[in-house]
Amino acid sequence: RVLFRSKHSASPAERAQAQRWCALSTPVLKSLFTQQAFEGASACLQVLGGHGYVREWGIEQHVRDARVTMIYEGTNEIQAIDLLLRKVLPDAGAALRELMAAELAPFQGSHPSLHDSAQEWHALTQHIATQPSSPTLAHELADDYLRGLGLWMMQLAWAHVERASLMLEPSGQARWSDPQQAFQRWVWPEWRMRMNIMQDALANQKVSL
């Protein structure tokens, strides 16, 4: 949707805004999903135990292939550093804040957790941007920052799924509610964990690795 607007919107301002969102989200999406692919393939291998390494199953090849994607086109850690130090902090997160607000506009009056987590994210970004005492702190937080932003974007995507489903089929809630609940139960709690890690690091001026 955003990529389409970046190319085909009739409004130059909307095209420019969409292009900024694509630039910010590209390292997030690359890192988030290649890491998830590796972890998913590894989990499949673990289910089979030692037999998962037998070539005829093919899982061991998927594990290797998925691992390569975390290195290809810039390692995920470099992508995280690029996101935070080159795309977010130079303007203290102002562009990110503007873009997140635009994405949240369709959900005014609904999805309070999405809005609350966005506000908490902006406060964290401001805190990182105004830390002069540790020149390496932003580098150390970059991986958690990228992962946390990616999880927020996944939360946003689920809100769009819900909205589109109800527009197309008002009675079709069951079609998306189960996977959405699974996301809320198993995936979204990691966002809070990442926030806690970064907030503790900022409070103590060190990172627990």
Q: Where are the predicted features?
A:
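Short, small-residue-biased leader/transition segments that mark boundaries at the very start
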Residues: 2-3
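Gly/charged contiguous loops adjacent to phosphate- or pyrophosphate-bearing nucleotide/cofactor binding elements
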Residues: 6
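Short, charged/polar, low-complexity loop and linker segments
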Residues: 11-20, 130-137
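Glycine-rich, flexible loop segments associated with nucleotide phosphate handling
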Residues: 15-26, 174-179
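Alpha-helix capping/hinge segments and adjacent helical runs
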Residues: 20-98, 185-208
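A glycine-rich phosphate-binding loop feature that marks nucleotide/adenosyl-phosphate handling sites
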Residues: 50, 58-62, 101-104, 136-144
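Non-catalytic alpha-helical scaffold/packing segments enriched in small hydrophobic residues
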Residues: 80-83, 95-102, 116, 120-123, ...
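C-terminal amphipathic alpha-helical interaction region
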Residues: 90, 106-209
